[in-house]
Amino acid sequence: MNLEVKKIDTANARLSTKLSVEDLEKRYDKIAQKIAQRVKIDGFRRGKVPLSLVKTRYQAQIEQDAQEEMIQEVLKNALKELGIETKDLIGSPNFTKFEKKDTHFEIEADIGLKPTIVLDKIQECVPSVGVEVPNEEKINERLKQLAKDYAKFVDTDAQRKAQNDDKLTIDFEGFIDNVPFEGGKAENFSLILGNKQMLEDFEKALLGMQASEEKEFPLTFPSGYHAEHLAGKEALFKVKLRQIQAREALGINDELAKIVLANEENATLELLKERVKGQLFLENKARLYNEELKEKLIENLDEKILFDLPKTIIEQEMDLLFRNALYSMQAEEVKSLQESQEKAKEKRESFRNDATKSVKITFIIDALAKEEKIGVHDNEVFQTLYYEAMMTGQNPENLIEQYRKNNMLAAVKMAMIEDRVLAYLLDKNLPKEQQEILEKMRPNAQKTQVG
């Protein structure tokens, strides 16, 4: 074996070698014998299939297995020559040349190695952090909302007219051209006026009605209505208002605190205010981090943390970004790329900068997560997907299986780890008094959220 290995930088190496066809063919018998032991061919007992028949029937597989065996041997020798352990090899080699000549194969390949990352400049990358601390006005607004949200609905007198924020129980039926339409009928249907559970014009027609009152009114479905058979259609609705209930006002006092903080012993209004302040602070922090600081931190990490990147991984990321982009392209653009290899190469190349940045940030986040012992359990990934399914009306089990089939669970976990690492770095840069607010909230992280 004529092997040449050159280390390009700390994360990349290149090998070139010539492998004799004779060496390849010597491997055929050994591989064919392994195949013969496990295959069953009619007329022969298992393990008794003639080698000549196996070589004929499984020729392509034998050649492929022999080539793979030789390649693994080449890689093993290349790593040995470089003084690198197998665990430091990252990704699959990128074969830039694999040509069969009369007597030998000419092979050239790029090898990716785990990069060396120095994290001593991390603190320089973290932007200054100052989260808005909620004032009394904001706290009182949230308390009023809590008093409203936790208020019970109670029956009203028969003379009351329906108004926004009342809970109504109605029967209704819709007609188009005097014919009832699918999904247009319900009995004992509950809604809260003003919450936009129904079309705005439908809810407006209910305002001012009294219990036991019946009413007919026209309604035009929006042109972009989700049920296509109703979009833009003129309808007539017949409604009977069965019941009106109004919220029973709750005072902002210790009683409210006991209702909201039901799991707390001796809950008081002061404790509730403290929890509300903490909750609002967390919301402000999340908004600031997600809308501004995390992206700024990523830009700083990309700019200031310098190290060699394995080109093989960048190429793989470019392929991934290119494939994903194809799904959102117009059919005409996809066809244009299929018809022109040059255009396809140019389009793929346009993803190089994004791919390089993505790979670099992934390596940095991984190194930081290991150093700070930040991780995500599989159960947390499943919980995240369950929540996504709930919010989008999907079956959770089906969604998880879809992610599993497409090998996307690892990507979800990595995204969650990235989010935690970035938040950890930013939290460390909070002013001392704001870190104290966070510390007060942590023991209550598993308890009832307020608002």
Where are the regions that the model predicts?
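Core FKBP-type peptidyl-prolyl cis-trans isomerase
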Residues: 31, 143, 154-206, 218-219, ...
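Phosphate-interacting basic helix/loop segments used at nucleotide- and nucleic-acid interfaces
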Residues: 88-97, 143-165, 349-350
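Beta-strand-rich interaction surfaces with strong enrichment in secreted/lumenal proteins
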Residues: 4, 95-97, 189, 203-208
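Extended, domain-scale alpha-helical bundle/helix-rich regions
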Residues: 63, 68-117
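Acidic/polar surface patches and capping/hinge elements
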Residues: 127-151
